[in-house]
Amino acid sequence: MVREKVRISTRTLQWKCVESRADSKRLYYGRFILSPLMKGQADTIGIAMRRALLGEIEGTCITRAKSKKIPHEFSTITGIQESIHEILMNLKEIVLRSNLYGTHNASICVKGPGCVTAQDIILPPSVEIIDNTQHIASLREPIDLHIGLEIERNRGYCMKPPKNFQDGSYSIDAVFMPVRNANHSVHSYGNGNEKQEILFLEIWTNGSLTPKEALHEASRNLIDLFIPFLHAEEESFHLEKNQHKITLPLFAFHDRLAKLRKNQKEIALKSIFIDQLELAPKIYNCLKRSNIHTLWDLLKNSQEDLMKIEHFRIEDVKHIFGILKIEKHFTINLPKNKF
């Protein structure tokens, strides 16, 4: 088990794993923090992340078993201790790890007597069994057991139809959920307008992913869901007091920031609030009054745009770009001779 003492940053938004352990081959636990957050942000992120962890991450499962010797699901086979239904339930519990897509075949070919476990499954090269000791069946007599299997990668639940028997083939209820459970909690600190929050996120997985891998996958899936909104273009809008149609671009500096969008740095910029930049109170208040709340909002404005803000001076612009050191990180052509 790994534990770290929690140290809270008062400046840059950051996340950290503060506890990590493997309780068994099929149960991993991780606890993470994200801070500092403004009031209300921790719940917003925590709720979305929990839903993504439980519903958006893909897993690999056995979805079908085939055998010509099986008349129906609740039948028994001489020499096997378990019923067919019990064997199917044991196959359902097998935890697999893979990056395959589509349906792939696997099989079990064993001669008794002896115990049949997960290590007896013959798998495609790209599929890994997390716990080879998982029990499947007990053969009491020297009989041959041949079962064909189908393996799929998906997400969420896949419920079998009521009539699932077809030519000795049985579909299996699949739970494509590497994350067993996820919880979030919020800790507030500070006073008055300075109040901030820490998000605590707890993740339990089945061993096919570590909690850190699950957090990364859920975050990426959430980003992918929101990217269409970032690339959308607002064609036009109507003013209430007249019928003039005005076409405005959604973002300024579209061409200059094309590369930035490609590598998703835009997402990071929208997560950095000007509250975290340690700006002078006067500059901070001027930006807030102009609806500039994040670093992304700030980068949409040229030097000339900033100078149009009431009570803003050239020294204030210099101060902002001095803090950001923007010329080292972003290609934005600002007139240097005015500094």
UniProtKB/Swiss-Prot annotation:
Subunit structure: In plastids the minimal PEP RNA polymerase catalytic core is composed of four subunits: alpha, beta, beta', and beta''. When a (nuclear-encoded) sigma factor is associated with the core the holoenzyme is formed, which can initiate transcription.
Record-stated family: Belongs to the RNA polymerase alpha chain family.
Alphabetized SMART domains for the sequence: RPOLD
Stretch list, region Alpha C-terminal domain (alpha-CTD): 267-339
Gene Ontology terms for molecular function: DNA binding; DNA-directed RNA polymerase activity; protein dimerization activity
Functional note: DNA-dependent RNA polymerase catalyzes the transcription of DNA into RNA using the four ribonucleoside triphosphates as substrates.
Catalytic reactions of this protein: RNA(n) + a ribonucleoside 5'-triphosphate = RNA(n+1) + diphosphate
InterPro entries noted in UniProt: DNA-dir_RNA_pol_insert (IPR011262), DNA-dir_RNA_pol_RpoA/D/Rpb3 (IPR011263), DNA-dir_RpoA (IPR011773), RBP11-like (IPR036603), RNAP_asu_C (IPR011260), RNApol_insert_sf (IPR036643)
Main localisation: plastid
Organism the protein comes from: Populus alba
A GO biological process held by the record: DNA-templated transcription
Keyword set includes Secreted: no
Assigned EC number: 2.7.7.6
Protein's recorded name: DNA-directed RNA polymerase subunit alpha
Listed SUPFAM superfamilies: C-terminal domain of RNA polymerase alpha subunit, Insert subdomain of RNA polymerase alpha subunit, RBP11-like subunits of RNA polymerase
